[in-house]
Design a protein with these regions (language model features):
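Basic, flexible Lys/Arg- and Gly-enriched helix-loop patches that mediate nucleic-acid binding at interfaces
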Residues: 1-150
Length: 150
């Protein structure tokens, strides 16, 4: 069977990538109306202006593209201009996190997807693979399985 990725990660992005051989499940997980939370750890270089973060919770338009609500928390202030942020979005548009960081005047040094909906990267090492149990799938995706049956 063909293996498909749910969503995508840019070439310079690392972290959680969901794989499936079920095309309907892949589509369900990507549907914008399901608004799965995507959470990223982002190492940035630059000055983080906390006053600019709060308005992003209502969304923002950058270069004619409307981005929905964006929540940014400062996880760790680094030395000088290095900082780790936690960015939470629900749309996952192409290069969304990078575009938002550029809008804030920040340069992305590292971008790691750590959550996609109910699925969490946790301690899985780079290149590691973990099968999602049927029980977890059914408990997290009741809407999907309710339509198709188990």
């Amino acid at each position: 069977p063909r293996v498909m990725s749910v969503g995508r990660l840019d070439f310079n992005t690392e972290g959680l990538l969901l794989l499936t051989n079920d095309g309907e499940l892949e589509r369900y997980l990507e549907l914008p109306q399901n608004a799965w939370l995507r959470r990223y750890k982002v190492r940035v270089r630059g000055t983080v202006d906390r006053k600019k973060l709060e308005p992003l919770k209502g969304g923002v338009t950058i270069a004619g593209i409307r981005y929905g609500p964006i929540n940014i928390e400062i996880e760790r202030d680094g030395k000088g201009n290095d900082h780790w942020l936690i960015v939470s979005i629900r749309e996952g548009k192409n290069r969304e996190v990078r575009n938002i960081m550029a809008f804030l005047g920040l340069k992305v040094m590292r971008l790691i997807r750590v959550e996609y909906g109910p699925f969490v990267l946790g301690d899985l090492p780079p290149g590691g693979i973990e099968e999602v149990s049927q029980g977890l799938l059914h408990s997290c995706l009741r809407g999907f399985f309710g339509e198709r049956g188990p």
